[in-house]
From Swiss-Prot:
Record's protein name: Flavonoid O-methyltransferase-like protein Os11g0303600
SUPFAM superfamilies registered for this protein in UniProt: S-adenosyl-L-methionine-dependent methyltransferases (SSF53335), Winged helix' DNA-binding domain (SSF46785)
Organism: Oryza sativa subsp. japonica (Rice)
Active site: residue positions: 280 (proton acceptor)
EC number(s) per entry: 2.1.1.-
Length: 374
C-alpha cells in the first residue's frame, strides 16, 4: 500500500513565521535601499569621500556636502543602511555606527571627476545608470506591471509597461514627447552602461580582437568603444553605426569612421561586426533581423568573418550575480521589448539567423563575449 502523501499545506513553525515576517518587511521595503542609494548619489557622497582622501567622517560629509548640522543623526542612519548593503564600508567598525566611511568598489564607480567630468581615474562614472534606474519614470512603469499583465494584448511583442504608462519607447525619438531632461538622463545612462567594463573586455578578452582587420560597432554611440579598440589594436579600422540623431555631425577623424543608418536595414561591411549590450533591448524576432543583417555584412568564416556579441548571459551561480541578471531581465521587461537570455536562448537566435557555430568567453562575471561564425 502506497504511503500517505506528505501534507504540503502544513503550517509553518513559529520560528519560520518570524523569519518570514522579516523577509516580508525586507521585500516590501527593498525600494527604500534603492532610494537611499539614489540619495547618496544625488548628494554626491561617493565623490566627497574620494576628495577627502578616501575616508570621511560624518562631520566631514556634513561640511563637504553643505548639509544642515541638524541632519547629522539622519545621515548616520542613511549611511548605516548603505554600509550594510555594500555601497560604502565602515572605516572604524563593522556597522558604520561610529561614523567614518570609505569607498567600496561599488561606490568607486559613482565618483565624479573634477568639474562633473564623467570619468575618474580611468573608470567611467555610473551615476547616470543609478539616476535612470531610480527615476520616477522607470519606477512608475514598474508600478504598472500588474495592470500590464492583466491586459489582453494579442501581439507577440506587446508594448512595454514603460510605453503604456508614458506613451514613449525608451531610446526612441518618441522620448522627445516627455520632458527633455528625461530623455537626456536615459541616454546618459545608456552611454555610461555601454562604456562600463569595456577596458576589462579589451584586457581579458583580447584574443577576440586579434587578427581582425576591420570592425563595425553597431549602435556604437559616441565612438568611445571604437576608439578604445583602435588604441589597443591600431591595425583595426573601425566604423561606428548609429541612428542619425546619435551620429549628428560627427565625422571620421582618421581613427574612427561614423555612419548614420539603421542596423535593421543595412550594416557597413567589415570583417567583424560588434553588438555590445544591444540585443537585450530587442525581442527575439528583432534580434534575428539584426543578426541577419550582421551576417550579410561579414565575409565567410575562412576569411575571418564573425559577429562579436558582448551581453548578459543568465546562468551565474546563485548569489548576487544571478540576482543582478534576473533583476536586469525584469528591468528589460518593464522598459523595453527585450530580455536577458541564457546560453540556450542565444544559441537559438544564432541558429535562426543562419549562423553555423559560436564560441563563448566567460570572463566578465554577469556578462560574456560571443564570437558567432557564419
Amino acid at each position: 500500500m502506497a504511503g500517505q502523501a506528505p501534507n504540503m499545506l502544513a503550517p509553518p513553525t513559529d520560528d519560520e513565521l518570524l523569519h518570514a515576517q522579516a523577509d516580508l518587511w525586507r521585500h516590501s521595503l527593498y525600494f527604500v535601499t534603492s532610494m537611499a542609494f539614489q540619495c547618496a548619489v544625488k548628494l554626491g557622497i561617493p565623490t566627497a569621500i574620494h576628495r577627502a582622501g578616501g575616508t570621511a567622517s560624518l562631520p566631514d560629509l556634513v561640511a563637504a556636502l553643505s548639509l544642515p548640522p541638524a541632519k547629522l543623526p539622519f545621515l548616520r542612519r542613511l549611511m548605516r543602511l548603505l554600509v550594510h548593503s555594500g555601497v560604502f564600508a565602515a572605516a572604524d567598525d563593522t556597522t558604520g555606527s561610529a561614523g567614518t566611511y570609505r569607498l567600496t568598489p561599488l561606490s568607486w564607480l559613482l565618483v565624479e571627476g573634477e568639474g562633473g567630468a564623467p570619468v575618474v581615474d580611468g573608470h567611467p562614472c555610473q551615476v547616470p545608470v543609478v539616476l535612470a534606474g531610480t527615476s520616477r519614470h522607470f519606477v512608475e512603469a514598474a508600478m504598472g506591471l500588474a495592470e500590464w499583465f492583466r491586459k489582453d494584448v494579442p501581439a507577440a511583442a506587446p508594448p512595454s509597461p514603460f510605453e503604456e504608462v508614458h506613451g514613449a519607447v525608451l531610446f526612441d525619438e518618441s522620448m522627445a514627447s516627455l520632458h527633455p531632461e528625461v530623455d537626456t538622463v536615459f541616454n546618459q545612462a545608456l552611454a555610461a552602461y555601454d562604456h562600463s567594463g569595456f577596458a576589462t573586455v579589451l584586457r581579458e578578452c583580447s584574443e577576440v580582437f586579434q587578427g581582425v582587420q576591420s570592425l563595425t560597432d553597431c549602435r556604437g554611440g559616441d565612438g568611445a568603444a571604437a576608439k578604445a579598440i583602435v588604441e589597443a589594436f591600431p591595425h583595426i579600422k573601425c566604423t561606428v553605426l548609429d541612428f542619425p540623431r546619435v551620429i549628428g555631425n560627427k565625422r571620421g577623424d582618421g581613427v574612427v569612421n561614423y555612419v548614420a543608418g539603421d542596423m535593421f536595414r543595412a550594416i557597413p561591411p567589415a570583417q567583424a561586426v560588434m553588438l555590445k549590450l544591444v540585443l537585450h533591448h530587442w525581442s527575439d524576432e528583432d534580434c534575428v533581423k539584426i543578426l541577419t543583417q550582421c551576417k550579410k555584412a561579414i565575409p565567410a568564416r575562412k576569411d575571418g568573418g564573425k559577429v562579436i556579441i558582448i551581453d548578459i548571459v543568465i546562468g551565474a551561480p546563485s548569489g548576487p550575480l544571478l540576482e543582478a541578471q534576473l533583476l536586469m531581465d525584469v528591468g528589460m521587461m518593464v522598459a523595453t521589448k527585450g530580455r536577458q537570455r541564457d546560453e540556450n536562448d542565444w544559441r537559438d537566435l544564432f541558429k535562426k539567423a543562419g549562423f553555423n557555430n559560436y564560441k563563448i568567453v566567460k570572463k566578465l562575471r554577469a556578462r560574456a563575449v560571443f564570437e558567432v561564425y557564419p
